[in-house]
C-alpha cells in the first residue's frame, strides 16, 4: 500500500495546508488591523526579488536530500503547494580535484526545480578531504573559493545560499572540540563566514547569503550565538540569519525564543530588523514521545499540527521562509 498510502497522506496534508492558510489569512488580517504585525523591510533589491514578502503560501518549503530530489518527488512537492526546497550542495561532490568544479549533478536539480517554480536554499556543506577542516587554512580559503564558484555558476537562478549546516554542533562542525556550542566553534565558524562572504559577493554581487544555521533554541545555542556576535559576526555582510528551531515541545514557545535571539543581536549592537529564516524544523515521527512530546500512536497527527502551528508562528514573527524537515528519508522525520 506504499504509493496509495503516500497519496492518501498527500491529500490529508494538502487539506491541512488549505485549512492552515485560511486560518493564516484571517489571523493576519486581524493582526494587521490591530497594528500588531510588522512586515520585514528588504535591505536590497536582489533580496526582495527572491524572498517573498509574507504572501501565503509562497514562503513554505521542505528539506530534500540526494535520494529524494528527483522529478517525481519534485512533482509531489509542487502538488502539495510548497514553493521552496532546501538541499545540500556538497563540496566534496563538486570539487574532486583541486580547482576543478563539476556542477553537473546539481544542474539537473536546479533545472528541475526551476521548471516547477520551486526556489532553493542551497546549503554549502561540508569540509573537503582535499584540504582538511575549514576551521584551518588552506581549507577555509578553499571553501570560500568553492562558494564563490557556486554563486557565479548559478547567478540569476532562484537560489539563496546557506553557509554550512548547524555549525554549533559536534555532529556537523566536528569532534575536535570537547563540546558543541563552544566559543571555539563560534570563532571558527565566524572566521569561515568572514572568508566566504566577501568572495561570494565579489563573484556575484546579487547573491543572497544565509549565515547561522543554528541548531536548537535553548540556553547553549543562545550562548553560541552570543559568542559569534562578540567575534564580529554582525559586522559581516551576509543577508539573512538562519535558525533551526528545535528544542521545545510547542511551536508557540519559539516566539519567546525568537525574541530572546533578537535581544542578543541588539545587545551586541546588531540590527534587530535584519531578516531571519527558519531553514529547518521538523517533528520526529519515530520519537514522538520525548523532546517532541505526545503519544507515539498519534505521531502523524502531531506532525501535521506542528507543520501548521510552526508556519503560523513564523509568519507572525516576520520570518519570510519556513523549511520543514523533511520530505523523505529514514530518520523518522519524513512527511
Show where each model-derived region lies:
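Bacterial N-terminal signal peptides that target proteins for export
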Residues: 21-32
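Bacterial N-terminal signal peptides
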Residues: 32-41
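Boundary/entry segment of secreted carbohydrate-active catalytic domains
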Residues: 47-83, 88-90
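Structural recognition of the beta-strand scaffold that forms the well-ordered cores
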Residues: 59-64, 83-89, 120-124, 159-163, ...
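Substrate-binding cleft and catalytic face of glycoside hydrolase catalytic domains
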Residues: 73-76, 80-234, 245-248
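Aromatic-lined carbohydrate-recognition surfaces of secreted/lumenal glycan-active proteins
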Residues: 192-222, 268-286, 319-329
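Substrate-binding cleft/loops of secretory-pathway carbohydrate-active enzymes
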Residues: 214-242, 284-294, 298, 331-334
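Aromatic/acidic polysaccharide-binding cleft in carbohydrate-active enzymes
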Residues: 282-335
Amino acid at each position: 500500500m506504499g504509493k496509495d498510502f503516500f497519496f492518501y497522506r498527500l491529500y490529508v496534508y494538502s487539506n491541512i495546508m488549505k485549512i492552515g492558510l485560511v486560518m493564516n489569512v484571517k489571523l493576519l488580517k486581524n493582526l494587521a488591523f490591530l497594528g500588531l504585525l510588522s512586515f520585514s523591510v528588504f535591505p536590497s533589491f536582489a533580496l526582495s526579488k527572491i524572498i517573498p514578502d509574507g504572501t501565503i503560501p509562497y514562503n513554505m518549503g521542505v528539506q530534500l536530500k540526494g535520494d529524494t530530489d528527483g522529478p517525481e518527488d519534485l512533482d509531489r512537492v509542487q502538488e502539495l503547494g510548497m514553493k521552496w526546497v532546501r538541499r545540500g550542495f556538497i563540496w566534496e561532490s563538486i570539487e574532486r580535484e583541486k580547482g576543478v568544479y563539476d556542477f553537473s549533478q546539481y544542474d539537473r536539480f536546479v533545472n528541475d526545480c526551476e521548471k516547477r517554480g520551486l526556489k532553493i536554499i542551497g546549503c554549502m556543506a561540508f569540509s573537503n578531504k582535499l584540504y582538511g577542516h575549514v576551521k584551518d587554512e588552506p581549507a577555509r580559503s578553499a571553501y570560500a573559493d568553492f562558494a564563490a564558484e557556486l554563486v557565479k555558476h548559478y547567478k540569476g537562478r532562484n537560489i539563496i545560499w546557506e553557509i554550512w549546516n548547524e555549525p554549533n554542533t559536534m555532529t556537523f562542525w566536528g569532534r575536535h572540540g570537547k563540546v558543541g556550542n563552544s566559543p571555539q566553534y563560534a570563532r571558527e565558524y565566524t572566521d569561515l563566514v568572514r572568508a566566504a562572504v566577501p568572495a561570494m559577493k565579489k563573484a556575484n554581487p546579487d547573491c543572497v547569503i544565509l549565515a547561522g544555521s543554528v541548531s536548537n533554541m535553548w540556553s547553549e545555542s543562545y550562548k553560541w550565538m552570543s559568542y559569534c556576535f562578540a567575534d564580529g559576526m554582525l559586522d559581516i555582510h551576509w543577508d539573512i540569519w538562519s535558525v533551526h528551531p528545535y528544542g521545545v515541545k510547542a511551536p508557540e514557545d519559539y516566539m519567546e525564543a525568537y525574541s530572546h535571539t533578537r535581544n542578543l543581536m541588539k545587545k551586541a549592537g546588531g540590527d534587530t530588523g535584519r531578516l531571519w529564516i527558519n531553514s529547518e524544523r521538523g517533528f520526529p515521527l519515530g520519537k514522538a514521545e520525548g523532546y517532541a512530546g505526545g503519544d507515539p500512536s498519534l505521531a502523524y497527527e502531531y506532525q501535521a499540527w506542528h507543520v501548521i502551528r510552526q508556519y503560523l508562528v513564523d509568519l507572525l514573527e516576520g520570518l519570510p521562509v519556513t523549511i520543514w524537515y523533511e520530505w523523505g528519508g529514514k530518520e523518522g522525520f519524513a512527511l
